[in-house]
Amino acid sequence: MSFGYAAEKFASARSVLMLPHPQGEDQSIATAFSECRKGLERFDRTLFDDSSSIWIKQLDQLMKTEGIEDPDREGLFLIKARQLSIDDQLQFSTVVDELQCWFSRRKD
């Protein structure tokens, strides 16, 4: 997995978190979750330094969907997005921004 691809996915996540949210804030957050997951899948996590490792751990915690039920098949990320507090939303936005910058500085 390339740093460039991850930077692109995190840039997309950051973009959907910006106003306005035509499909609602929760849907924007769920879409950003999906973009972050795509940016990190198959990425060797041993490549992260101390700072980025902390952001990744924060991101993993914010995106954690274990124990969430989805009887109406809305999508686990959408349900998780609805559960985030304002502080969680702020932390998520900050982590996405930090990781996008980190990946961008290391592009192939």
Where are these regions (language model features)?
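Generic signature of intrinsically disordered, low-complexity segments enriched in small/polar residues
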Residues: 6-8, 13, 36, 46, ...
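Short terminal alpha-helical segments
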Residues: 1-34, 93-100
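Amphipathic alpha-helical interaction modules
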Residues: 19-68
